[in-house]
């Protein structure tokens, strides 16, 4: 199984450690195409890559993915775009949201009946939500 993990990069890296732990867990289910999202200093690692290269690479990964897990705790234009693109490809999508961040979840996520979104407070809770999502997809 190929899994596309989406998390904020340019929109803010407050959840970087959480991304890393979730991505590590997702490797139990298959190949995580976007494991770099959990890396420290990702912005420095991608400095040599043009925006066009990043866009084309990520779209290619989305087209090859069987499933998307998106952490939507930190608002991100890129993550929103990726979710919308994955939706057009009919890829099952799980959006994870941690309310401790105090940032409101976009109605474009919470109101969309074509995707699943769940709140979590700990990484362990997120893992259980992932397990349930994987079982049903």
Predicted segments, located by residue:
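Conserved catalytic or regulatory cores that recognize and/or transform ribose-phosphate-containing ligands
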Residues: 1-137
């Amino acid at each position: 199984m190929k899994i596309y993990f989406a998390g904020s990069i340019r929109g803010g890296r407050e959840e970087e450690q959480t991304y890393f732990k979730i991505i590590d867990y997702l490797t139990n289910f298959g190949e995580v195409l976007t494991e770099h999202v959990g890396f420290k200093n990702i912005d420095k690692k991608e400095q040599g890559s043009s925006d066009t290269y990043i866009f084309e690479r990520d779209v290619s990964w989305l087209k090859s993915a069987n499933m998307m897990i998106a952490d939507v705790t930190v608002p991100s234009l890129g993550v929103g775009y990726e979710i919308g693109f994955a939706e057009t490809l009919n890829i099952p999508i799980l959006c994870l949201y941690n309310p401790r961040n105090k940032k409101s979840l976009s109605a474009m996520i919470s109101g969309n009946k074509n995707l699943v979104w769940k709140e979590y407070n700990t990484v362990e809770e997120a893992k259980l939500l992932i397990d349930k999502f994987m079982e049903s997809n």
